[in-house]
Regions:
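Conserved HGGG/HGGXW glycine-rich cap/lid loop of the alpha/beta-hydrolase fold
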Residues: 9-62
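Conserved alpha/beta-hydrolase catalytic His-Asp/Glu region
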Residues: 124-130, 141-197
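N-terminal cap/lid segment of alpha/beta-hydrolase-fold proteins
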Residues: 1-10
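Conserved acidic catalytic loop of the alpha/beta-hydrolase fold
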Residues: 70-88
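Conserved loop-alpha-helix segment in the C-terminal half of the alpha/beta-hydrolase fold
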Residues: 202-239, 244
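Gly/Ala-rich beta-loop-alpha elbow adjacent to hydrolase catalytic centers
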Residues: 92, 96, 100
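Flexible "cap/lid" loop of the alpha/beta hydrolase fold
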Residues: 101-106, 110-142
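Residue in the alpha/beta-hydrolase core beta-strand immediately N-terminal to the catalytic nucleophile
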Residues: 53, 89, 112-115
Length: 257
């Protein structure tokens, strides 16, 4: 397992394949780089593919303190430069989706295009904001039940594969409490419309069922966005229906990047 160190934090990643543009896969809140395995395998046939464990996640270091989206962006920009990847296609899920958006806004010289796979809300509806805030408070108080219930009930369809739900829960619930709480605070503090207003690189949004960001609002915030919508999958659509996701990313790459 290769690593790089940025600002004292060791970051684990996998690298495979050859070809430009390179892909960087960015997982979501309390997940790890394995969640994009179906996409990494598919695109490594013709492209260099790098899958990263964000700080606080997977096999990367898990420092105390805040976890703003900007910290992930700085880490990824450092990784792109260090590995000499050129201009990449940044593919992010959930928290990783808004990280890809901010990366495209801050570093257009390093980004050929972004793919946001059911990204975290660019604007949080008040009721959802309050509910997630209560989950953060519960985590900090040592109560993990609301966190588990949120993952199992809100992020999957009733028809989702039970083995996949179990696997996702196992990884996400293993995340240390300080990371889970502070990373979610970073998500809630993110100014999505501001990032969207500054992001001028080609962008693809892949909505799930139900979408965290309705496509018509994504078009309003990010006029250059291409909207797609997976069928028969909840929030983890890149794992539930990988062929659909791979096909749409491939079409985006051919026609827009």
């Amino acid at each position: 397992m290769p690593t790089i160190t940025h600002n004292g934090v060791k970051l684990a990643y996998d690298s495979r394949g050859k070809g430009r543009p390179a892909f960087v896969f960015i997982h979501g809140w309390t997940c790890d780089r394995s969640f994009f395995a179906p996409q990494a395998k598919h695109f490594a046939r013709r492209h260099r593919v790098v899958s990263l464990d964000l700080r606080g996640h997977g096999q990367s270091d898990k420092p105390q303190g805040p976890y703003p989206i900007s910290a992930y962006v700085d880490d990824i920009a450092f990784l792109i430069s260090t590995l000499r990847l050129g201009k990449v296609v940044a593919v992010g899920h959930s928290m990783g989706g808004i990280t890809a958006l901010q990366l495209g806004a801050d570093h257009p010289d390093k980004v050929a295009g972004i793919v946001m796979v059911d990204p975290a809300p660019l604007i949080w509806p008040p009721e959802l904001n309050a509910g997630v805030g209560a989950i953060v408070a519960a985590i900090e108080a040592g109560d993990q039940k609301p966190r588990r219930q949120f993952i199992a009930d809100a992020l999957f369809m009733k028809t989702s594969d039970k083995a996949l739900v179990k696997r996702v829960l196992k990884v996400m619930m293993a995340s240390p409490s300080h990371v889970a709480a502070n990373a979610m605070k970073g998500i809630l503090a993110f100014d999505g419309p501001a990032a969207a207003a500054r992001c001028k690189v080609p962008a693809l949004h892949l909505a799930a069922t139900p979408p965290l960001n309705p496509p018509h609002l994504m078009t309003q915030w990010l006029p250059n966005v291409v909207n797609g919508w997976t069928v028969g999958a909840g929030h983890f659509n890149m794992m539930e229906v990988p062929d659909q996701v791979n096909s749409m990313i491939g079409a985006f790459l051919r026609h827009y990047v």
